[in-house]
């Protein structure tokens, strides 16, 4: 009897050690309330630039404070982890990732690791309120207040309903390509960023390639990490429940 597709898609490639495959794989559907704390210990804090942790039963995240937050952690709702549940103020937000060290999981080395991917499924209450809503991979480096200040990046960015591809190479200016695909208020979509072993990046929106795309290749030897960067515009984005987050080697 063949292996069911819903099981087979999680099986590791024979060419990759099982322990290493499992170590690089992250899946979270945000059903349980996390424990929050400051990186390094103590209570979570909300000053611009602060870094905190969110610990779920099976996964761990870090979040970097953008602006100033009096609500110190995002909360779980019936839909998922609501990244919009902190302060509703223009230029306030957060970046969600798994830590900024190349030793932290999951990070990937272009040209050394096998092909890898990130998948995020989420909803946006008010798309006109997203100053930036970025999902993708960036260089493993210190968290930045401005997403355009990362040295290298390949991501999808939802701005005022437009789904854009945004890329950065070697600290140069951000290159923005409008996919011409759109996101309406309260809609739920799935974004996927795929990186080949050679660093070639492709994108999917709800399982299909964008209408308009842009070529990009990460530099060989670069360490990259998955991230979600969310920042309020003056109109405010409201609830942004993250329903699924999955990252690892491509099957």
Task: Give the role of each language-model region.
Residues 118-120, 186-196, 201-203:
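Short tryptophan-centered beta-strand motifs in secreted/extracellular beta-sheet-rich domains
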Residues 111-113, 158, 184-186, 196, ...:
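Surface-exposed coil/turn segments at beta-strand junctions on protein surfaces, enriched
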Residues 83-163:
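Secretory/extracellular carbohydrate-interaction modules
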Residues 167-190:
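Short, aromatic/His-centered strand-loop micro-motif at the edge of beta-sheets
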Residues 5-64:
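Extracellular carbohydrate-recognition regions
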Residues 8-14, 217-251:
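Ligand-recognition surfaces built from glycine- and aromatic
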Residues 178, 198, 205-225:
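Short, solvent-exposed beta-strand-to-loop segments that form ligand-recognition rims
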Residues 167, 203-205:
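Conserved aromatic beta-strand anchor motif in extracellular beta-sandwich/beta-rich domains
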């Amino acid at each position: 009897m063949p292996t069911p597709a819903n099981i087979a898609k999680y099986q590791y490639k024979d060419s990759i050690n099982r322990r290493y495959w499992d170590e690089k794989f992250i899946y979270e559907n945000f059903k349980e309330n996390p424990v929050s704390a400051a990186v390094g210990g103590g209570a979570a804090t909300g000053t611009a630039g602060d870094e905190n942790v969110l610990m779920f039963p099976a996964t761990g995240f870090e979040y970097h404070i953008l602006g100033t937050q009096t609500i110190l952690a995002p909360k779980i709702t019936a839909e998922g982890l609501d990244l919009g549940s902190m302060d509703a103020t223009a230029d306030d937000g957060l970046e969600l990732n798994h830590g900024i060290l190349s030793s932290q999981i999951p990070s990937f080395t272009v040209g050394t690791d096998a092909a890898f991917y990130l998948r995020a499924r989420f909803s946006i209450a008010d798309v006109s309120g997203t100053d930036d809503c970025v999902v993708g991979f960036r260089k493993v480096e210190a968290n930045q207040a401005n997403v355009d200040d990362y040295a290298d990046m390949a991501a999808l960015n939802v701005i005022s309903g437009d789904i854009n591809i945004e890329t950065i190479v070697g600290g140069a200016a951000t290159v923005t390509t409008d996919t011409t695909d759109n996101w309406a208020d309260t809609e739920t979509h799935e974004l996927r960023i795929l990186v080949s072993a050679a660093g070639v990046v492709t994108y999917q929106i709800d399982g299909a390639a964008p209408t308009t795309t842009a070529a990009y290749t990460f530099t060989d030897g670069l360490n990259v990490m998955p991230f979600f960067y969310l920042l309020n515009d003056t109109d405010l984005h409201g609830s942004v429940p993250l329903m699924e987050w999955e990252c690892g080697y491509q099957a």
